[in-house]
Amino acid sequence: MQVLESQKLSGHIRVSGAKNSSLVLMAAALLADRSVFLSNVPLLTDVEVMSKLLVSMGVELRRNKNQLEIMTSGLSLFSKDLSCEAFHSLRASFFCIGPLLARFGEAKIPLPGGCRIGARPIDEHIQALKALGARVEIQNDYVVAKAISPQKRLIGARIRFNCKSVGATETILMAATLSQGTTILENTAEEPEIQDLATMLNEMGAKIQGAGTSQITIEGVDRLKGCSYTVMPDRIEAGTFLVAAAITRSPLTISPVVPEHLEAVILKLQECGCLIEYSGNTLSVIPRKNLQAVDITTRPFPGFPTDLQAPFMALMTTVKGISKIQETVFENRMQHVGELQRMGATIVLEGNTAVVIGGNNLKATSVTGGDLRSCAAMVLASLAANGTSVIQGLEHLDRGYEDFAEKLNAVGANISRTHSVPLSSQE
């Protein structure tokens, strides 16, 4: 990708459906005994990989652009046509273990993968599945789980997570919907994607209360039906475009968004000196020319999202002053620091804390995005750099941003790609 310095952006950017919601909702569809219709599903390589994984389990999929019909009548326990590598490439593939275990009383799923941004163990998932009455073992790179009750059903339980894990909360939330009795989950993650999942499951006939808080109660039911559901807007994509406006000192409007999902980001941008106005599901951002350096510490929702740490660091390199950026969610999420330094940024890295001495003019060069969000940060930094930058590692970008370059070009950026990963709009 070649990115030319953008003096000013102006206009409106449409936010796609949430990647992280889409993936878990696709897995949740496995719980239904009828078709599930999802709309606002983004065209992303992660979604395509997840689609192929579901098809390999006997699921029939029909896609028309951003709409997806998932039919589970042919669902089988084990993937027959896809290698473990396909599962390893997508961490969200592990979401399938909960629905399979809930419906069939057993499941066999390869160990998950995803971006290399530190250890994201599945210990919490496994311990919670055991608490629901499953025997869980790791055999030759597979997680094998079986319900041990005579009825081959999971049994409701009170489970307290050791940490606020989004993946574990979602996995056990799905598994418990078809369990016998009531499950109470404590110290649960509170991310909006969990609320999105619970809302769809309730429309399918589940009985879930408390999603979005630190305690969720699930009353098990005998079956879940199909439904039609619209994926919520992607809060991380929206936040990325807010940072794009700030880093280029440009006015932009962004929609659709759920402002409550972005409160921590909006507060930090306002602290920087950006004027942000609300109108329904639309945000308008008008940055001041002279922004101020601010500190951030990543936290689980409702704190500042780790997925926007890299884009925000790129912004801080363009602001005069010293900012301290602390990463507390993942232990290996500073891969972008070296690339920003190659562009002329002054950053001192001490473990998971970066001290950014901002105000230097970034210079265009060749950089590589090592993961999804650092790749987005490289694009944003290049918009503010003098000259033309070349960005490698676009396979990461295509995992989580739909039409990223096209959306930015529509508001005045000058970005060209020499190669793109083809995404089929119909299947």
Swiss-Prot record:
The keyword Electron transport does not apply. CDD domains: UdpNAET. It catalyses: phosphoenolpyruvate + UDP-N-acetyl-alpha-D-glucosamine = UDP-N-acetyl-3-O-(1-carboxyvinyl)-alpha-D-glucosamine + phosphate. GO terms for biological process: cell division; cell wall organization; peptidoglycan biosynthetic process; regulation of cell shape; UDP-N-acetylgalactosamine biosynthetic process. Pathway: Cell wall biogenesis; peptidoglycan biosynthesis. It is found in: Cytoplasm. The active site is at C115 (proton donor). One of its GO terms (molecular function) is UDP-N-acetylglucosamine 1-carboxyvinyltransferase activity. Its EC number is 2.5.1.7. The modification 2-(S-cysteinyl)pyruvic acid O-phosphothioketal is found at C115. UDP-N-acetyl-alpha-D-glucosamine binds at R91, D307, V329. It is an enzyme of class 2 (transferase). Keywords: Cell cycle, Cell division, Cell shape, Cell wall biogenesis/degradation, Cytoplasm, Peptidoglycan synthesis, Pyruvate, Transferase. Phosphoenolpyruvate binds at K19, N20. GO terms for cellular component: cytoplasm. Belongs to the EPSP synthase family. MurA subfamily. This is UDP-N-acetylglucosamine 1-carboxyvinyltransferase 2. It comes from Prochlorococcus marinus (strain SARG / CCMP1375 / SS120).
